[in-house]
Amino acid sequence: MKAFDTFDANLRKNLLMLFAAGLFFWSGLASLLPTLPLYIEHIGASKQEIGIVMGSFAIGMLLCRPSMGALADIRGRKIVLLIGMSAAAIAPLGYLCVKSIIPLMVIRAFHGISIAAFATAYIALVSDLAPEHRRGEVVGYMSLVNPLGVGIGPAIGGFLQASAGYTPLFLSSAALCSLGLLCIIPIINPPIATKPTNSKNDNFWQILTSHRVRIPAIVLLLSGLTLGSLHTFISLFIKSTGVDLNPGLFFTAAAVSSFSCRLFTGKASDRYGRGLFVTMSLIAYTFSVICIWQANNSFMFLLGAFMEGAASGTLIPMISVLMTDRALPYERGRIFGASLMGFDIGLAIAGPIFGTFAETLGYRNMFGLTTGLTVIAMIIFLTQSSRNIPQSLRFALGRTEDIYAVK
């Protein structure tokens, strides 16, 4: 992290407050990861209903991501950060007030606005602030808020749920995100980049289907399906196997692995290219799901968690930096919104689809099916990530530059 010593005081302060806000955001959000499915089951929901409620989170992301990206480009990143953090602070209080499926779906969808706004504005602001030649390194370090939060949050949530019940759990989640709001207030919004008058006016769907965005979005779609099924059902799968493992430890192990990978992959990608690390992350995702599919003891579950953390800790930052490389400053919010649309769709439909599979096939066979998704994602990236198959292979293996990068 020596790169930060070379930055001026105002830039360091901005990055520090942004990092603190991100840490509170992901801790509050992640405190519900291992516990909310159990809460929904506690009030009498079926496996499919659990999947539908959990998947509703991504519906909020899906509906709001395009508008949040555009708002970040037009009005600045800070206002979108505030919108996202406010949604994250309010939603946990809503869970306390309802005990039926439909209202829970509505609140869960509202909760999804938090990531649509905060995550989009966060990565856009970091990209604005990072020096171009150290972009991968700075984005990698600043993205550590995710594994740190996802490591701290489930431990807090699991402890509170087991020792004090659901009310303190939801109140603590709201309190953490309220602290995040206080961290955003002193952040100085950088000047808004203006669009040149002679530039092409691409709409959201034109951006999404363009060569520079389409393949990363498809890879994120398949990864979102995998991650959505895992995060929705891993707690229930562990419980169904009878293995003596706190589900919160699964998420903590994944977070430790994710943290470790982000320490060096960002800086390494500045030297070896983004494509190589995207490929490595998809390989790790495949091995992760295989471990979980075959797990019958704590070691295999934790090994799967370690591989999943390495995969997600590499894939999301690498795609984020890849999209930054391919975007001009005045369109970064929309580019991030479009590329992450695939991830949102995957998360949105994973719960209902794989909840149905879990009802008929059981949790173990359901995870077996998800293995194919990561293999397909890897094949697509290896063959379609650049102009043609040979060029794509070279890019995906770190042998050539990204032809879509903005020079």
Name every feature range the model reports, one short phrase each.
Residues K2-R12, N189-P216, G398-K407:
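Juxtamembrane intracellular "pre-TM" segments in multi-pass secondary transporters
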Residues A58-P66, V150-G151, A255-F259, L263, ...:
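Residue-level signature of mid-helix packing/kink "hotspots" within the transmembrane helices
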Residues L63-L96, R271-Y272:
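Conserved MFS/SLC helix-loop-helix module at the cytosolic interface between two early adjacent transmembrane helices
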